[in-house]
Amino acid sequence: MVFDELITEFDRGLRSIAGVSRMSRPVPKPAAAAPAELSAAERKHAAGLMRVNHVGEVCAQALYQAQKLTTSSAGLKEMFEHAAREEEDHLAWTAHRLKDLDSRPSLLNPLWYAGALAIGVVAGRLGDKVSLGFMAETERQVESHLDGHLSELPAADAESRAIVEQMRADEVKHGKSATDAGGIELPMPARMLMRAASKVMTSTAYYL
């Protein structure tokens, strides 16, 4: 681990928490040319869902940073970096959509980031196969979570839907990459604990 790498990851972490992440791909757009009008209630609900998604991407940045820093494999470092760059797009897209909805990111982003970073370090210290298994299980749970949001988003909110659909496609790809790279299936207690932690995060971030 070199000093330059630590500085780079520290900068990425600050940008993730502050909501000023860079995007390498443009914000996904729906096929319809003109956005539909949302009621006040629909905007509030869509904003809550997109705030949850934004928090998920803050956590993803922390997890991948920790896993990248704790592996000694150059190939896995590159895989985690590639996934982190795509997740950084998600972070920027959801922040952009929150602004469009006249809303804001979670006030607890520093807490979410710190917790995810600690979990990522623990997963990384348990070895590459466990770390990759953790990545695969995380992506499976995120995929399920995004499926739920696609059914919950207001029918008229095509802009948020386009973003979530592309995020879902990327998460599926990341999960498959982790499994193909040798990730093991985590034991049921670990998967249940991850779901419980995710439920606390999503139910809180919707409002805060």
Curated annotation (Swiss-Prot):
Its EC number is 1.14.99.60. Fe cation 1 binds at residues 57, 87, 90, 171. One of its GO terms (cellular component) is plasma membrane. It is found in: Cell membrane. SUPFAM superfamilies: Ferritin-like. Binds 2 iron ions per subunit. Pathway: Cofactor biosynthesis; ubiquinone biosynthesis. GO terms for biological process: ubiquinone biosynthetic process. It catalyses: a 5-methoxy-2-methyl-3-(all-trans-polyprenyl)benzene-1,4-diol + AH2 + O2 = a 3-demethylubiquinol + A + H2O. Fe cation 2 binds at residues 87, 139, 171, 174. It is a peripheral membrane protein. Its cofactor is Fe cation. Catalyzes the hydroxylation of 2-nonaprenyl-3-methyl-6-methoxy-1,4-benzoquinol during ubiquinone biosynthesis. This is 3-demethoxyubiquinol 3-hydroxylase.
